[in-house]
Amino acid sequence: MATASESSSSKRWLPLESNPDVMNQYLWGLGLAPDEAECNDVYGLDDELLEMVPKPVLAVLFLYPITKKSEEERIEQDKEIKEKVHSDKVYFMKQTVGNACGTIGLLHAIGNITSEIKLSDGSFLDRFFKSTANMTPMERAKFLENDSQIEDAHSVAVIAGDTPASEDADTHFICLACVEGELYELDGRKAGPISHGASSPATLLKDATKVIKKMIEKNPGSLNFNLIAISKRT
């Protein structure tokens, strides 16, 4: 999804499909070791379906529809976010490229679990997080915007999807991750990370679904929701 927060750049990509197989190949190609972690579909928010998701869950990606109401809420949230201080251990970046939210969501996920997984030495992900470690969220966004390797890899992942991609996407990815005992919502279109209270690696998935249920309740008539868990391979 491309919005006002991305207006600093005229660059637009095609949106990434919410498809765990596509995302796995994408991440593994960028330097996440295949035996370290993988993306899995979450088929529903009931306890029985959540139990089917491979554990431990390291991060969650959520795709939801952009509406007038959600945009108004985002603007209001930004006013509050700017006044709050979050842990400097949270890896957060802005989104300046249209329709790059899938890639941004994956980078938010990996960037906040680097202590739990191994990245291949010298790979894109290894170099990206080392290069951007001390940057501001906007500097990270610009670094990504100017990197042709990730743009090419994103394009390949888009083509690998099961459905044709349209530039006029009306859905958006966010990431939910646990950092230092807190559940954070990471959305590059917002002013910064949003804390949703206490969490832990053991309860991350259930804690994230509580946040997600509230988001779904605000748009009950839509079916354009999708949830993907990034799980540690054991």
Curated annotation (Swiss-Prot):
This is Ubiquitin carboxyl-terminal hydrolase 3. It catalyses: Thiol-dependent hydrolysis of ester, thioester, amide, peptide and isopeptide bonds formed by the C-terminal Gly of ubiquitin (a 76-residue protein attached to proteins as an intracellular targeting signal). One of its GO terms (biological process) is ubiquitin-dependent protein catabolic process. PANTHER family: UBIQUITIN CARBOXYL-TERMINAL HYDROLASE. GO terms for molecular function: cysteine-type deubiquitinase activity. The keyword Lipid metabolism does not apply. The lineage of its organism: Eukaryota, Viridiplantae, Streptophyta, Embryophyta, Tracheophyta. Residues 12-232 form the UCH catalytic domain. The record marks Q95 as: Transition state stabilizer. The keyword Protease applies. It holds the Pfam family Peptidase_C12. The record marks D187 as: Important for enzyme activity. InterPro entries: Papain-like_cys_pep_sf (IPR038765), Peptidase_C12_UCH (IPR001578), Peptidase_C12_UCH_sf (IPR036959). The active site is at C101 (nucleophile), H172 (proton donor). Coiled coil: none annotated. SUPFAM superfamilies: Cysteine proteinases (SSF54001). The gene is UCH3. It comes from the Eukaryota. Its EC number is 3.4.19.12. Keywords: Hydrolase, Protease, Thiol protease, Ubl conjugation pathway. Belongs to the peptidase C12 family. It comes from Arabidopsis thaliana.
